[in-house]
């Protein structure tokens, strides 16, 4: 194992990062009235289209139907993505991030808990954004809204009153994400573990795709769902480490994850953080939405036909 990972794993074992980044439904319920605690619903829907691609839409209607008491809806595709980009879910500027989360009543010193009523990847994407801008205390509700409901906890409907706040002046940590040119350069240099977080089917080149089927040549397949239990809670730290070990992630100098548009790929990044690993890890933000459109950037298709 590369020493850069071993040092972080050793430190993580001493501080228990799972307690820092995950919260159970029962623990959240006991703290809902705590000063400085803000709960965000990141629900988004992603659906295959007839042309073989994908369409996405905010889950605001889901939020209006049911949400954790006091939670605010946070629009990943709208307020928390770069409106000037031709790609969905592109990282916003520091100013846009501060305005958007400030409008939800969040300040830089608040404790933020994020959940989704659909796939956890929407919550991990929002968690990653907060960490990208240096927010210190941000957690995921383990198991999402389904776990909250399974615990028999209270649900609200309708809109939640917003009280805007001044977030502050965050600094975007640009070493936490890369573009396609950086992938090409780092693959050529060596020492990179590139992880595809889409389904095995999509990795092979079957089913819906982002312009060209298949995966970036040289990347490993670790589907986002493989990091989770059946109830959508995160697997144990030992299981997560073994899962990443299986593709040789810790034998390389750097880990970069990608998917279709920078959403599912935040699940392995969050899983690494649960092990105490955040240094040397980056997200390919635009992922295959960018890569597949570049005809001379190498892709591999394992499916026949």
Q: Where in this protein do the model-derived segments appear?
A:
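Cytosolic catalytic domains that perform sulfur/thiol-centered chemistry
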Residues: 1-305
């Amino acid at each position: 194992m590369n020493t850069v990972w071993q040092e972080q794993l050793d430190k993580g074992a001493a501080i228990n990062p799972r307690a820092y980044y995950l919260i159970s439904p029962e623990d959240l319920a006991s703290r809902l009235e705590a000063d400085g605690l803000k709960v965000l619903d990141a629900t988004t829907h992603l659906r295959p289209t007839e042309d073989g691609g994908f369409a996405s839409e905010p889950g605001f209607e889901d939020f209006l139907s049911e949400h954790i008491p006091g939670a605010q809806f946070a629009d990943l595709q709208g307020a928390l993505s770069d409106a000037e980009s031709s790609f969905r879910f592109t990282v916003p500027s520091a100013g846009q991030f501060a305005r958007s989360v400030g409008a939800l009543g969040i300040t830089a010193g608040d404790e933020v808990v994020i959940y989704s009523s659909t796939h956890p990847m929407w919550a991990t994407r929002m968690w990653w954004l907060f960490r990208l801008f240096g927010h210190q205390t941000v957690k995921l509700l383990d198991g999402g809204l389904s776990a909250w409901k399974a615990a028999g906890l209270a649900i609200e409907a309708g809109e939640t009153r917003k009280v805007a706040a001044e977030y502050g002046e965050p600094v975007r940590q640009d070493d936490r994400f890369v573009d396609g040119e950086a992938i090409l350069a780092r693959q050529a240099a060596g020492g990179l573990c590139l992880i595809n977080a889409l389904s095995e089917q999509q990795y092979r080149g079957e089913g819906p795709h982002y312009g060209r089927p298949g995966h970036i040549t040289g990347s490993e397949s670790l589907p986002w769902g493989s990091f989770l239990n059946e109830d959508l809670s995160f697997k144990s730290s030992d299981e997560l480490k073994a899962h990443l070990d299986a593709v040789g992630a810790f034998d390389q100098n750097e880990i970069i994850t990608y998917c279709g548009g920078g959403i599912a790929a935040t699940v392995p990044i969050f899983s690494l953080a649960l092990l105490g690993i955040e240094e040397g890890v980056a997200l390919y933000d635009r992922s295959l939405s960018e890569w597949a459109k570049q005809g001379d950037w190498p892709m591999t298709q394992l499916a026949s036909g």
